[in-house]
């Protein structure tokens, strides 16, 4: 399906699209591991973090802060770093220090002049509140995992967004970096979606193409707001 000709509502995934969570997680792990003289390999950390977090999120719902604590302990164990569970709070405590990508705020300001905006985030309300202090532009809608009690790729975020924006659904575009978490459920729900493919990930056989694919959030902005 093509992008709507008259886009009115634009939503974003937050972490990975607006916020550089990979750097934030790596720096948090390394800072805590420094206490034990342990070195973290970022290239090993990030894929294991994604895999383990996704597994935990697929179980019974719990607040994202708890997901992070559990993920921290399991990832550390796999890396050979003996982290006691009592120290795992370092990871949710680091979320307020996860910073936006360089182009994020300039693009949000441009979007805000033309569209209504929202965030659909796999996070709890408290942690997103801390993150929003780094983001410019007013939001017309926020849907968190805490509100719908599930994590993407479960479709609850997108169903709730569609319910709230009502008649604007046909003029809604979602922008996200996560293919499994955001692109696939959008395609299933027939929501126009722009994939911010920062790592030049190649689609696997059987995976459907997004409505549009770009390399950065800035390029996504040019697609919707070329002026």
Describe these PLM feature segments:
Residues 1-10, 109, 115-227:
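Asp-based, Mg2+/Mn2+-dependent phosphohydrolase catalytic module
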Residues 3-102, 124, 128:
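N-terminal helical cap/lid subdomain that shapes the substrate entry/recognition surface
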Residues 31, 74, 106, 160, ...:
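Surface-exposed charge patches
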Residues 66-71, 106, 156, 215:
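Generic recognition of short, well-ordered alpha-helical interface segments
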Residues 95-111, 117-120:
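Hydrophobic, well-structured mid-protein blocks that either form specific transmembrane helices
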């Amino acid at each position: 399906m093509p992008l709507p000709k008259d886009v009115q509502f634009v939503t974003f995934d937050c972490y990975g699209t607006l916020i550089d969570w990979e750097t934030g997680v790596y720096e948090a792990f390394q800072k805590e591991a420094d206490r034990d003289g342990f070195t973290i390999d970022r290239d090993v950390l990030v894929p294991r973090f994604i895999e383990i977090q996704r597994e935990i999120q697929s179980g019974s719902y719990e607040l994202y802060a708890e997901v992070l604590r559990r993920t921290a302990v399991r990832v550390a164990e796999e890396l050979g770093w003996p982290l006691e569970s009592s120290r795992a709070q370092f990871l949710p405590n680091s979320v307020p220090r996860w910073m936006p990508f360089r182009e994020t705020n300039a693009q949000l300001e441009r979007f805000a002049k033309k569209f209504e905006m929202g965030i659909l985030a796999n996070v709890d309300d408290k942690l997103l509140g801390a993150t929003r202090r780094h983001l410019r532009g007013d939001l017309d809608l926020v849907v968190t995992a805490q509100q719908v009690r599930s994590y993407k790729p479960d479709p609850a975020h997108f169903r709730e967004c569609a319910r709230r924006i009502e008649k604007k659904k046909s003029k809604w575009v979602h922008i996200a970096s996560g293919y499994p978490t955001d692109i696939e459920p959008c395609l299933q729900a027939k929501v126009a979606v722009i994939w911010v493919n920062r790592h030049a990930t190649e689609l696997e056989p059987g995976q459907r193409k997004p409505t549009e694919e770009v390399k950065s959030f800035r390029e996504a902005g040019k697609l919707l707001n070329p002026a």
